[in-house]
Amino acid sequence: MAKKVANIVKLQIPAGKATPAPPVGPALGQAGINIMGFTKDFNARTADQAGLLIPVVITVYEDRSFDFVTKTPPASVLLKKAAGVEHGSGEPNTNKVATVTSAQVKEIAETKMQDLNAADVEAAMRMIEGTARSMGFVVEG
């Protein structure tokens, strides 16, 4: 018989840097999860992705055990890394802050493909291009 799901917790945590401090600790404590167990597992699983923000979906069961699934980093984080900027534009229609090439967009789309609701890479590229434009980036090519 399958375990009954008690709660689902969604967080975005820097890769390899989960700690019991806020915001991770309180969110997991409310769900009744062993915080140290989660942080060790998460940090081990994401050690190779240092510097990126990793979304994680934690499924908590009634017996207080848990499973978690890490997703790919948000498109905005990958775009900022590709463009080499700290943050997007506050006025994306008038103030362009960076440029990304279509090759960079394709690479990001291929990385994000498993988490996007897209039929093929071209559709995923259009989604990533839209995100880039809304951040004040110019897409070349």
UniProtKB/Swiss-Prot annotation:
SUPFAM superfamilies: Ribosomal L11/L12e N-terminal domain, Ribosomal protein L11, C-terminal domain. The keyword Ribonucleoprotein applies. Keywords: Methylation, Ribonucleoprotein, Ribosomal protein, RNA-binding, rRNA-binding. One of its GO terms (molecular function) is structural constituent of ribosome. GO terms for biological process: translation. PROSITE patterns: RIBOSOMAL_L11. One or more lysine residues are methylated. Disulfide bonds: none annotated. It comes from the Bacteria. One of its GO terms (cellular component) is cytosolic large ribosomal subunit. The keyword Ribosomal protein applies. It holds the Pfam family Ribosomal_L11. Part of the ribosomal stalk of the 50S ribosomal subunit. Interacts with L10 and the large rRNA to form the base of the stalk. L10 forms an elongated spine to which L12 dimers bind in a sequential fashion forming a multimeric L10(L12)X complex. Forms part of the ribosomal stalk which helps the ribosome interact with GTP-bound translation factors. Belongs to the universal ribosomal protein uL11 family. This is Large ribosomal subunit protein uL11. It comes from Pediococcus pentosaceus (strain ATCC 25745 / CCUG 21536 / LMG 10740 / 183-1w). The lineage of its organism: Bacteria, Bacillati, Bacillota, Bacilli, Lactobacillales.
